[in-house]
Regions:
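Short loop/turn segments that connect beta-strands within beta-propeller blades
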Residues: 4-8, 43-47, 53-55, 114-118, ...
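Asp-box/WD-like beta-propeller blade repeats and closely related beta-sheet repeat scaffolds
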Residues: 19, 36-78
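Short coil/turn segments at the loop-to-beta-strand junctions that recur within blades
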Residues: 17-21, 63-68, 126-130, 267-270
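Glycine-rich, histidine-containing beta strand-loop boundary motifs that form or position
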Residues: 5, 27, 34-36, 42, ...
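Blade-loop segments of beta-propeller domains
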Residues: 2-30
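Beta-propeller domain segments
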Residues: 72, 89-95, 99-101, 106-109, ...
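Short coil/turn segments that connect the beta-strands within blades of beta-propeller domains
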Residues: 27-28, 80-81, 139, 225-226
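Predominantly a core beta-strand signature of beta-propeller blades
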Residues: 8-11, 46-48, 55-58, 108, ...
Length: 274
């Protein structure tokens, strides 16, 4: 991980990391992730503005699941000042909490929050989210979810979801998108699962939503206030490629979805995703 100091020099902040993807800033400290760990460097602004030696990283946690399939940890602090961490399913389709090969670990396929040193569930049944953000007015958490593969070109759809209540269940591995039952797992729904939370928007199969960010600035026209910008990485498991664009999802100040449209396109050329 690198940073630019006050003299515009690029400085290495941390190195020799394993799949470090999540980076966020909170209360003067820089936080970053590895697959099974989260670290921080304290007083990073003071260090970079004074050209002091960068201190050693401090361990926040090292007990997260270590599978690399959907194992990258995209991290951020919420409006409640708590650290949010998604844990993707270590497979295309499976039920890790019931399978010995995954140590019956219930943390897979979830979004968790670190609250005073203890982990708690924000959302479960989430296959693989690599982008989330909070509505600037309601503070509700919105997240994308990448749908499973090998069910054909057009199903199931990737999703945009909202968390209205903590520990809600969003369907994986039993149900996908609005009403697509999984051919392998829909007949194995346990008795304690009595509700699936539907997505607020189906994005299309295999488009792979990644980065999400609400806009609350003053530079764009007023119609973009409270708009969620989403990057769609694009497909691989499809005969004709889709995605490869940025979508704008417009909400009102109460968090109600108004409409959505493409914001930037043009990366998909000659149907090759190049």
């Amino acid at each position: 991980i690198s940073a630019i100091d006050k003299d515009k020099n690029v400085r290495i902040v941390a190195e020799n990391l394993s799949n470090s993807t999540g980076v966020t800033y909170y209360d003067g400290d820089l936080y970053f992730s590895e697959v099974n760990s989260i670290w921080k460097i304290q007083n990073i602004d003071e260090v970079l503005l004074s050209s002091k030696q960068i201190p050693e990283k401090v361990l926040v946690t090292d007990n997260l699941p270590s599978d690399t399939w959907h194992g990258w940890k995209w991290i951020d602090f919420g409006p409640d000042n708590k650290l949010y961490v998604p844990v993707g399913a270590p497979c295309n389709i499976c039920n890790p909490s019931l399978e010995e090969k995954y140590n019956f670990d219930k943390r897979y396929a979830s979004i968790m929050r670190l609250n005073d040193g203890e982990w708690e569930y924000v959302a479960r049944g989430v296959r693989n989210t690599v982008g989330f953000d909070w509505h600037p007015k309601t503070n509700n958490l919105y997240f994308g979810d990448n749908g499973r593969d090998w069910m054909g070109d057009d199903m199931p759809s990737c999703e945009l979801n909202v968390v209205m209540n903590d520990d809600s269940f969003y369907g994986y591995p039993y149900k996908h998108s609005m009403d697509v039952l999984d051919p392998d797992y829909s007949k194995k729904i346990p008795d304690n699962v009595d509700e699936f939370i539907d997505p607020i928007l189906e994005l299309g199969a295999h488009v792979a939503p990644t980065g999400l960010s609400f806009y609350d600035g003053d530079h764009f026209p007023a119609k973009y206030k409270n708009t969620l910008f989403m990057t769609l990485h694009g497909s691989w498991n499809r005969s004709r490629k889709v995605g490869y664009k940025i979508k704008a999802v417009h909400f009102d100040e109460n968090g109600e979805l108004l409409y959505h449209k493409d914001f930037i396109t043009g990366w998909l050329q000659k149907n090759k995703g190049q």
